[in-house]
């Protein structure tokens, strides 16, 4: 035998060992190839347009109220027992609408704001800024932001100084083994309603333009398992000049957004929207409407294989707060704040000789509007006043008037301005107002109010435009002839108490709010 040739013969025992080793390595290889499958469950609760409804009490009418954060607290205690990682999000409009917010916006400005205290107590995770959160001004919303133990988010509110978002654009949460990115937006229509000095140093970008920048950036930088948009903007847009309500438009873009939590338009919505060009995926859009009468509840199941998301299931519903008992622990915790607000509202400010009803302003002159017009005319020394019935449901009985009653006239903190307008502009403004207000002709049932096409008696919003846009004038004598075409209905005769004819070319001092 050639000594350079070596052979090796394995014994049966050694062959068995080799087979075992190959078997083990093969099993390891197979295990590495089979990705690990995990299932994650997450619950998201969504509120919006709370407008300061913190206590279960109607401060204006001095009686028990509906909804409120106190009832939400009861629901949260129950949910968190079984789902402790629940995300609690709000789509804005918290700082105006109820007496407690007014009190802490303008009366007691040193204490911690009741809204930040209550939301911290409830454990909110993020809030998108609303127009009524900007309207109180920097002194209020900047202080509020410092007090909140959660991020205020709005990617399209931009600092003029830095060119970057003034608030945090988005926040990423890790809950139930998932990375959840929450991107915030607000309606860019704020400059149309809110005086510039209240948002000095800021501007408001279009939501779709902003989303086109931030969504891909978040997906690349954060690689979230879920992408949620929390947005103070409604479903349908009817304004040709700017995208006030971007819900449907953004859902149509898709962009990988899983969930759109919207608000602003006070409408309860739940809709699956298939993005343009998509044949499979849909975006869930949901809005629980205003006042905290209900909460949007989205229960999410995400399946991962090897750490990669392979399926998502979203099951939406609404939790009604009707009949829910207010949380007694919550009420005890905020008893001092409640008492402070109630004492302020009980301050006597005047007396009424007869009852005043807001709905009377829909059909003609009324003491309700007379009070507002008189205050406006006297406050700025105007010749003419424009005002609309901001609360048509308001009823003030004859007798003493208290601070709480003033909120029935003006539930929001509107600002009074004096403008220089020509007679032609004044008539044009009234024509515009009555075009949305008055019927195009006397209807068969004698109705004078213009309704939405197809409006039903049970509809919450029946009028062609909201009554808070029904601007009428005082300080002039004028008629509105409904038998004439739109644009030719208003005839202004004279300034009230004057004999000279109204001059369309003259400039007048006009009070508006």
Task: Pin down the residues of each PLM region.
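Bacterial N-terminal signal peptides that target proteins for export
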Residues: 2-17
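Bacterial N-terminal signal peptides
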Residues: 16-26
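Acidic, metal/ion-coordinating pockets
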Residues: 31-323, 363-375, 385
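Feature captures C-terminal
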Residues: 35, 40-43, 53, 63, ...
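N-terminal accessory/precursor segments of enzymes
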Residues: 184-195, 314-318, 328, 343, ...
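Flexible, glycine/charged-enriched surface loops at secondary-structure junctions
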Residues: 221-224, 230, 345-349, 383-389, ...
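Acidic, Ser/Thr/Pro-rich beta/coil linker or hinge segments at domain junctions
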Residues: 320-352
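Glycine-rich phosphate/diphosphate-binding loops and the adjacent beta-loop-alpha structural elements
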Residues: 345-365
